[in-house]
Design a protein with these regions (language model features):
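Hydrophobic transmembrane alpha-helices
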Residues: 2-49
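Helix-boundary and loop/linker segments of multi-pass membrane transporters
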Residues: 2-9, 36-37, 73, 101-105, ...
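Hydrophobic alpha-helical transmembrane segments
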Residues: 10-15, 44, 48, 56-63, ...
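Alpha-helical transmembrane segments in multi-pass membrane proteins
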Residues: 16-23, 50, 61, 65, ...
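Interfacial aromatic-anchored transmembrane helix boundaries in multi-pass membrane proteins
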Residues: 23-39, 64-95, 131, 136, ...
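Helix-loop interface residues and adjacent transmembrane-helix termini in multi-pass membrane transporters
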Residues: 29, 52, 102-105
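Generic transmembrane alpha-helix motif of multi-pass integral membrane proteins
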Residues: 41-56, 94-99
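Membrane-embedded alpha-helical hairpins and interfacial helices in multi-pass inner-membrane proteins
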Residues: 76-78, 82, 97, 101-174
Length: 174
């Protein structure tokens, strides 16, 4: 029975990674009014992995999406890769702490919005550390954090819908 659950778990995580990667590649093709603003829909799969299997699964989905996505888009080890990795690590860590603490107290919307805020904040810190003068930080924060928060709320709403709609399935794989 354990082997069957492990196979189901691995295949489910594989599907989440594939979906996250597909959304990541799709988002890269969408023109944006600001270069750093993306919908962040690929983070939906990280959140579902976190809520279904815990922090290790969420971290795995995020890392595979960021690394494989960067390899496919030709940006591996570029500044954009560093920003994506820093944001992904920060958001996954914050969301994992919220989930581990007692995620029933937090809605997927709150977890996602907080993770998106951490994602944007980490990206601004990396930008400030490597590319910008520290005086640019106050100017840049609202331009990054407000779209991040909006994206996080949208992702949280979608996660809630997916979790409610597929509740019967998630019980079987968790």
């Amino acid at each position: 029975m354990t082997q069957r659950l492990n196979i189901r778990r691995v295949s489910f995580l594989g599907v989440l990674v594939a979906l996250a990667l597909a959304l990541h590649l799709l988002e890269a093709q969408i023109p944006s009014p600001l270069p750093w603003v993306r919908p962040g829909l690929a983070n939906l799969m990280t959140l579902i992995a976190l809520l279904t299997y815990g922090w290790r699964a969420g971290l795995l989905v995020m890392l595979l999406r960021v690394v494989i996505g960067a390899l496919l888009l030709g940006g591996f080890l570029s500044p954009a890769f560093a920003l994506s990795l820093a944001g992904g690590l920060a958001s996954t860590l914050v969301m994992a702490l919220m989930v581990r603490g007692a995620w029933r107290l937090w809605s997927p919307l709150a977890i996602s919005a907080t993770g998106a805020f951490a994602h944007g904040g980490a990206q601004v810190l990396v930008l400030t550390a490597f590319l910008l003068r520290s005086g640019d930080l106050p100017w840049l924060l609202p331009w990054v954090l407000v779209p991040s928060l909006i994206s996080g709320i949208a992702t949280g709403v979608l996660a809630n819908l997916v979790l409610l709609r597929w509740q019967w399935y998630f019980r079987g794989v968790a």
